[in-house]
């Protein structure tokens, strides 16, 4: 056995790694890969300590509205809204701004901190841009909440326009690692995603970006994506668990276990210690609705319904996270 083999097989010290991270150290891919074999309870406990050190007990809670549904030109294999698959999902154009405003006001009144307008499709085009602009502008005028949006692969000009409407944060998931991305989608590329994220950042936007776990990717893929997000400076990272949708290519994939998700969340905390790790789609499949993940490094959530699947009520989520000792409060970007 070589010296390299001995080094790789040497059990990593979680406590030593925690202390290095607290002092500002960025863990390497090799160190992150060793965490895949670390004892789960110990790993999650130390990840929670790292979360407390950098983020205290602040919890970030957001909600979304499916403001344009279905008829998407892209072929993402997980997605109910792709026109490539016969999923029978709802199809409609941009919702009336009064409807978007109504749900936003309701969610803010229930205690949500951020409210995101999400639209299907590769990007917004023509009058769609003006319609979403008007909705964002109206929300900013008539509510005190923080407005976000997920608008696909806009260019810098499009992001600048939305910024002028008062938009501060844009969501654009990487979805997967560079290596695995082509197994998820072939109608746009990983670099298209990266370019859109950088265009939003250049326009002065804060970007929220993460991915979907359980699509057949390896642990190396998951870690590669976490490191990519760190390099992009992402401070809000949605971690979705695949919810297999009938008639999509991923319909028969077995969902991950809660222990899988706990380990993923914990490793993401080690790699991105200062970020808000946000449980997102698929959380409703977990028996504990994500409670164990909120003790394993996660400190944010999308609450309420997802885009095409039922979620967990705002009231239920608030009760759970407050019982865990969190304080739901907005940390300004």
Curated annotation (Swiss-Prot):
List positions binding [4Fe-4S] cluster.
Answer: 72, 76, 79
Sorted UniProt keywords: 2Fe-2S, 4Fe-4S, Biotin biosynthesis, Iron, Iron-sulfur, Metal-binding, S-adenosyl-L-methionine, Transferase
Q: What is this protein called?
A: Biotin synthase
Q: Where does the Radical SAM core domain lie? A: 54-283
Positions that bind [2Fe-2S] cluster: 116, 148, 208, 278
Q: List required co-factors.
A: [4Fe-4S] cluster; [2Fe-2S] cluster
Q: Which residues form the signal peptide?
A: none
Against PROSITE patterns, the record matches this protein to: RADICAL_SAM
Organism in which the protein naturally occurs: Brachyspira hyodysenteriae (strain ATCC 49526 / WA1)
Source organism superkingdom: Bacteria
InterPro entries xref list: Aldolase_TIM, BATS_dom, Biotin_synth/BioAB, Biotin_synthase, Elp3/MiaA/NifB-like_rSAM, rSAM
